[in-house]
């Protein structure tokens, strides 16, 4: 099976799960690379051999979602879900080999991102600004994640708007002004992505409609000009002498 065929199968299953959840009034949206593929259909797809589906959902419908996914042939990891189910759920389908990760209300990785208020803005995926931030918060950003950021940046304009066809700069600005750690990681990654662009063409964004360098500059200027909270200023005095990010823990599945 080719990668393209496998990814199409994953995408179809992801959409079907979202549709079924909607029929039961359960908020479920794709996140990660597959979500970015949905939002950037005119760009070359990210190469992936994974067999996992990543979703975002809400704590209020966690039990109903567990029942729904189980009815579709997936087995819940009962130990994992008992320990971490307030923030993440895991399921696996023994027949297809597919697995499902569901983030509840927030991303908890190098930094914490609360997406609950924006969960249902788009029909199949989490909001593009949240997808962008979920990548920019990675302290050890790799080239695939950088390309995912660029895919979003050449597709969606940055605006002070909740328009579904744009990325809402207000969300970005508020986060950059509230949390110095977030600001430090994001500005570091903006510089890394800009350096990648300077190294040569990025095939991942061939056909993009927006200038990635201009978009990166908008983000950089917004991060620098965001009104800064008292806690931001206090933490900035400590700077990098103290680790400003969390180290994501590896949580085994069974």
Language-model segments: residues:
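The feature captures the alpha-helical scaffold/lid subdomain characteristic of nucleotidyltransferase
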Residues: 1-27, 40-48, 98, 104, ...
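Short gly/ser-rich anion-binding loops that grip negatively charged ligand groups
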Residues: 7, 55, 59, 77, ...
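Catalytic nucleophile loop
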Residues: 32
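Short, active-site-adjacent cap segments at secondary-structure transitions
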Residues: 35-38
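Catalytic metal-binding acidic patch
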Residues: 41-65, 69, 149
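Conserved catalytic core of two-metal-ion nucleotidyltransferases
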Residues: 66, 70-111
């Amino acid at each position: 099976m080719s990668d393209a065929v496998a990814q199409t199968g994953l995408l179809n299953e992801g959409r079907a799960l979202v549709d079924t959840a909607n029929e039961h009034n359960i908020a479920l949206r794709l996140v990660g690379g597959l979500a970015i593929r949905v939002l950037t259909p005119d760009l070359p797809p990210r190469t992936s051999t994974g067999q996992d589906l990543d979703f975002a959902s809400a704590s209020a419908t966690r039990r109903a979602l567990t029942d729904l996914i189980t009815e579709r042939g997936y087995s819940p990891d009962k130990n994992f879900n008992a320990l971490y189910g307030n923030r993440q759920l895991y399921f696996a389908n023994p027949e297809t080999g597919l697995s499902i990760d569901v983030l509840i209300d927030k991303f908890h990785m190098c930094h914490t991102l609360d997406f609950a208020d924006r969960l249902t803005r788009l029909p199949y995926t989490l909001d593009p600004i949240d997808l962008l931030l979920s990548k920019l918060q990675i302290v050890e950003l790799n080239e695939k994640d950088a390309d995912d950021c660029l895919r979003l940046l050449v597709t969606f304009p940055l605006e002070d708007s909740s328009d579904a066809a744009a990325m809402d700069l207000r969300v970005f600005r508020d986060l950059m002004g509230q949390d110095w750690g977030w600001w430090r990681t994001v500005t570091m990654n903006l510089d890394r992505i800009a350096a990648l662009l300077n190294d040569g063409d990025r095939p991942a964004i061939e056909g993009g409609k927006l200038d990635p360098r201009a978009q990166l500059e908008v983000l950089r200027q917004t991060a620098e000009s965001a009104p800064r909270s008292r806690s931001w200023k206090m933490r900035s005095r400590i700077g990098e002498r103290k680790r400003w990010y969390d180290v994501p823990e590896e949580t085994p599945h069974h």
